[in-house]
Amino acid sequence: MWDSPIIFTRMRELVQSVSPAALSWAVVAVYIGTFFWLKSRSSKQRLPLPPGPRGLPLIGNSFQTPAVNPWEKYKEWSDEYGPVMTLSLGLTTTIILSSHQVANDLMEKKSTIYSSRPQLVMFNRLSGGMNSSGMEYGKRWRDHRSLQASVLRPWMTQRYTALRDVETKQLLAELLKTDDFSSCFKRMVASLFMTLAYGKRVQYPDDPEIRGMEELVRVKSEAGEASFRATGQLVEYIPLLQYLPSFLTPWKEMCDRICEQFNKTFVDRLREGINAPAWTWAKEVSKHKVARPMSELEVSYTLGTLYEASLTSQQILRIIVLVAALYPEKAAKAQEELDKVVGADRLPAAADVRNLPYIDAFVKEALRWRPFAPLGAPRESIRDVEYNGYLIPKGATILVNQWALDYNEDVFPEPFSFLPERWIANPDLPFSTFGFGQRGCPGRYFAQDSLFISTARLLWAFNIRTASPVEVEDMLRNPSAGAFLSPIPEFDATFAARDAQRKALIEKEWEIAPKESYAILREVEKELTSEA
């Protein structure tokens, strides 16, 4: 793995080498020209845009939008202007959707129109345009999605039980010895993916497999932020800036170097998975008919993209721990259900899911109460559409304000209260954590199955408490949140085995559990073959 401090030193040198005057004049010229071109185009529109707060010439609402937790301000505005609202962020027309009804009308019922992405210049440069998360809607994106779906169909993810069983048993055994739950979650999530994709279990929190992949993703993120602070923000607002000469765009060299590291890592992993002596995702996607015309590199990205997405599961599990620690009376109700259905003589199993409605409600309420992705990921409208007398123009960026959906008092009374019971009283409550339409999370079924069994076993095994006082307000609003994601701040928790019998059972189950990757994958393959 390459030395990130050296990279960032070089990045600073690249940025400092740009003449501020030259860059400023170039930016101003492109910005003003683009503004008047868009202005002349919008003047031809016959329908009005949805209402929204008034902005300033050239910059629109950019300086009215808070840098931290903008979804709360968007909800405040939507309460005034309605569930379909227009913002002007630089040169970008952004439509904010703030109700389940509107989100379903547009993102589900007209999914094809709203399944594209805006031009994410920095993001796509960092991946050479091969990360399906940033692709425009079209054949290439559909091909990548087909390969991902080939290993993530609902019936297939249910057959990964043998691996989930082993990984969650190791998780429980680890938490008997340490309260460092974040590291334990990191290992388990990475191992689930690495085993299925490439045939290699991750057995220790400090395993080189974790460090290497995590470092790569971290450096990508930090480099993206560093260049964003230099010229990246401007290039996202004004994509034409990417075509300026290289001496005015030093961030491109950095993106290309990071992309090379991703390329090598993903291809090396794909080859390992193909050569593994057992069934793997790498083998499955490589032999798929859709993959035949693709390069090896492109096929490798279909799995590499899933790895990056899987990292959010760590944060979701941390939310489960947080609510269990903050609301012990709710965790106790979940434990009552587990004791009645499962007892103390065995671990909860996947087959118990239909008999554990409170566990299901506990998970759904946790993800509603503390959404990890309050603004989801941006979409783009591929053509002009009329909706309720307003124009949603072609090329507009569409954001679903998940925070507004989850904190709508008409749908979720007392939204700041953690109330799993609401899902028992009304099983038809809208649950949209994993997105809408064709562009929703490709791994939603795998994530839900893994999250359910992990939560059931954690609550069956442990009484979870905060190790030091935690303010709920601090957990809901992360001051270091990004533009779209909001991981919860760090906090400490303790895990005490509920009784000696459960502790002994955890130790025994982990002692006799299969730990060799290929043996586990052969069990998975048997399950898949029997279904087929």
Swiss-Prot record:
EC number(s) from the headed UniProt entry: 1.-.-.-
Location within or outside the cell: Membrane
Reactions accelerated catalytically: preechinulin + reduced [NADPH--hemoprotein reductase] + O2 = neoechinulin A + oxidized [NADPH--hemoprotein reductase] + 2 H2O + H(+)
Gene3D superfamilies: Cytochrome P450
Pfam families documented for this protein: p450
Names of the cofactor(s): heme
Membrane topology per record: Single-pass membrane protein
Transmembrane spans: 18-38
Function, in words: Cytochrome P450 monooxygenase; part of the gene cluster that mediates the biosynthesis of echinulin family alkaloid. The pathway begins with the biosynthesis of the cyclic dipeptide cyclo-L-Trp-L-Ala (cyclo-TA) by the NRPS criC via condensation of L-alanine and L-tryptophan. The prenyltransferase criA then catalyzes the first prenylation step, a reverse prenylation reaction at C2, to yield preechinulin. Preechinulin is the substrate of the cytochrome P450 monooxygenase criE that catalyzes the formation of the double bond between C10 and C11 to produce neoechulin A.
Protein name: Cytochrome P450 monooxygenase criE
